[in-house]
Amino acid sequence: MDASAEQSLPEPGSQDSVAGEDIEIVVNVGGVRQVLYGDLLSQYPETRLAELINCLAGGYDTIFSLCDDYDPGKREFYFDRDPDAFKCVIEVYYFGEVHMKKGICPICFKNEMDFWKVDLKFLDDCCKSHLSEKREELEEIARRVQLILDDLGVDAAEGRWRRCQKCVWKFLEKPESSCPARVVAVLSFLLILVSSVVMCMGTIPELQVVDSEGNRVEHPTLENVETACIGWFTLEYLLRLFSSPNKLHFALSFMNIVDVLAILPFYVSLTLTHLGARMMELTNVQQAVQALRIMRIARIFKLARHSSGLQTLTYALKRSFKELGLLLMYLAVGIFVFSALGYTMEQSHPETLFKSIPQSFWWAIITMTTVGYGDIYPKTTLGKLNAAISFLCGVIAIALPIHPIINNFVRYYNKQRVLETAAKHELELMELNSSSAEGKPGGSRSDLDTLPPEPAAREGPSWGSRLKLSHSDTFIPLLTEEKHHRTRLQSCK
């Protein structure tokens, strides 16, 4: 910088360099010029804009540590930042809080707040929830990318036993990984259907046989088919347990508990039958066996493992507990009120079917849920009027929470598709940058397999700094710095 420009700066210790509350601070953020005043900025002295008040006394080093450029003639500070985000950030000086405008990326906005040194506590609660939701999405994308990278990478330091476990786990848990894995997944799906159909067919009297003691039991052919299915389910569960990287988490997960409930009744029934025969307590044992056989219906839930739609529906119902609780509360109040009214109004009829209020609960339930079996019905005019009102109230009560539940389902389904697309997009960009760094104009995904092993794990940078390590618009905060260098990504400035 020339001498004339240096001389145009206020001298340290001069009157001009002393910050006052009436000083004007002119900032140019992304081409948008803004005039701010010292008394306004001094409310939050720890922010970057407030530091501009006293920076002139520190010379060029201090000035350029705070801004990208400075015009001594105009006393104008230049910042190469997002002007839209800046307009939101300076609201803290006027209103004491910050609102993130629609259309601004939450993660970029957080970076802007960090740059201007405005604490996140000034961000409004509604905007914090949006930022938290976006952060969860990024963590999910990072988790998916990390899993795919782990599957693609081969660590030569791992033993043969560990590599074998990873291959078995990938074979059983990721049907899309290979053609044989798809075949096994389809076979498992078909066996679930076959075992469910066999369970139902075993209750048909024409397909049952009489044993030596005169009891009707399932046909031996159906029992053999069920035994074969149970053998497959058992082998599949044991292999997945054997290859699981975290066996405790595997055993306690919901879907694996369903798998255990699907195969456990078979072995418990078999054990109780043999023990009962020895102890001559066949009556009690048979009752226990029949009770356990009912648990076989749990195997139908195994279909959720092969159906993303069922998994989405389960998640939507879990997220709709509040709406479902309101529905049950409305129905419970309505059942109590209308059953009591129905019992009271029907007492004048000599052939009334409403013997008591608890017995009337059944009538209120089937009326409010629009089932109407017809086993209990009102016979008086007031009773019929009460039935009509209870019917209408039931329709309204059931319809109210349906829309939020559908919204939760659609939102989660769309979110899963977006996350899946974002993860694939990030991997494609990683591969593209890796191929470009190697001087290959068109590398293939198999190039990732030849990457050097990942360095020893160490504590990575903070969440905010990890965001800047990604080169694309899809930030993946959980990927470590070594992983990014491993794929030769360019830092996002």
Curated annotation (Swiss-Prot):
State the UniProt keywords alphabetically.
Cell membrane, Ion channel, Ion transport, Membrane, Potassium, Potassium channel, Potassium transport, Transmembrane, Transmembrane helix, Transport, Voltage-gated channel
Q: Which InterPro entries match?
A: Ion_trans_dom, K_chnl_volt-dep_Kv, K_chnl_volt-dep_Kv5/Kv9, KCNF1-like_BTB_POZ, SKP1/BTB/POZ_sf, T1-type_BTB, VG_K_chnl, Volt_channel_dom_sf
Q: Which Pfam families match?
A: BTB_2, Ion_trans
Q: What ranges does the Cytoplasmic topological domain annotation cover? A: 1-183, 245-249, 311-324, 407-493
Which parts of this protein are intramembrane? 358-378
Q: How does it sit in the membrane?
A: Multi-pass membrane protein
| Region described as Disordered | 434-468
Q: Where is this motif: Selectivity filter?
A: 370-375
A single GO BP term for this record reads: potassium ion transport
Q: Where in the cell is it found?
A: Cell membrane
Check the record and name the SUPFAM superfamilies matching this protein. POZ domain, Voltage-gated potassium channels
Transmembrane ranges, per UniProt, are 184-204, 224-244, 250-270, 290-310, 325-345, 386-406
Q: Which GO terms describe its molecular function?
A: potassium channel regulator activity; voltage-gated potassium channel activity
The primary site where this protein sits is: membrane
Its Gene Ontology cellular component terms are: ciliary base; voltage-gated potassium channel complex
Report the sequence similarity comment from the record: Belongs to the potassium channel family. F (TC 1.A.1.2) subfamily. Kv5.1/KCNF1 sub-subfamily.
Subunit details: Heterotetramer with KCNB1 or KCNB2.
Protein function? Regulatory alpha-subunit of the voltage-gated potassium (Kv) channel which, when coassembled with KCNB1 or KCNB2, can modulate their expression and their gating kinetics by acting on deactivation upon repolarization and inactivation during maintained depolarization. Accelerates inactivation but has relatively little effect on deactivation. Coexpression with KCNB1 or KCNB2 markedly slows inactivation.
**What is the protein's given name?**
Voltage-gated potassium channel regulatory subunit KCNF1
Organism of origin: Mus musculus
Designated gene of the protein: Kcnf1
